[in-house]
Amino acid sequence: MIKKIFLLFFILITSNISAQEIAVLQYGGGGDWYSNPTALPNLIQFCNDQINTTISRNPKVVKPNDVDLFDYPFVHMTGHGNVFFTQEEAKNLRDYLLSGGFLHIDDNYGMDQYLRKELVKIFPNKELIELPNNHVIFKEPFSFPQGLPKIHEHDNSRPQAYAIFNEGRLVLLYTFESDLGDGWENPEVHNDPQEVRLKALRMGANIIKYAFED
């Protein structure tokens, strides 16, 4: 019995050591960076179960000017309202992205008008480019022939996926008019049909896979 307990403890310890960590971005400006609290943990569980990732089940929280930012290969950002980066934060985010990091921004409806002007601080000489439906991020491991799926309807606008590239590498993905994070939340939060939640989780898995491998 003691041996079994020790073995279980050893497995838990080694699995935690080998697990990859990802983070949520705690930005300034008053926007609700903390919205969709069950979203990322659910996406992590889905990815670990379905595409064999080994991501730590509890995402961390990181600020734009934290040195720890560089510890995470994938950082997620969401919210409904205002976003603000200081020049120091913008530089740190730029350095992070140019050093191999990946930022996924999911507009939870209401962020767009604030976000776009702050992205200019990070990359003053780069523009958001809409991804075509045949981009690899919509192909692997799950196929989305029509591109970014629509998860929540707000104003009858089509879902759009925008990107910023550096030397051919996609470093920032901005999902707009889709609301992927709402689809990742616990079922009882939005009462989405299972097929809608599955679309959101599968698209999220594609993003995670792309961020980790490209």
Model regions and ranges:
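Short alpha-beta junction capping motif
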Residues: I22, F74-Q113
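Acidic, glycine-rich loop-and-strand cores that form catalytic or ligand-binding grooves
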Residues: K117-L148
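Sec-exported extracytoplasmic/periplasmic mature domains
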Residues: N48-N52, L98-G101, V120-P124, F212-E213
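Sec-dependent N-terminal signal peptides
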Residues: K4-T14
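Surface-exposed patches in mature extracellular/periplasmic domains of secreted proteins
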Residues: T54-K63, I105-N108, K126-P132
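Aromatic-Pro/Gly-enriched surface loop or interdomain linker
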Residues: S18-F74, T78-G81, V171, D179-L180, ...
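Short, surface-exposed beta-strand/loop micro-motifs that present aromatic residues
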Residues: N65, N156-L172
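Solvent-exposed loop/turn segments at secondary-structure junctions
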Residues: Y27-G31, H80-F84, F102, Y109-Q113, ...
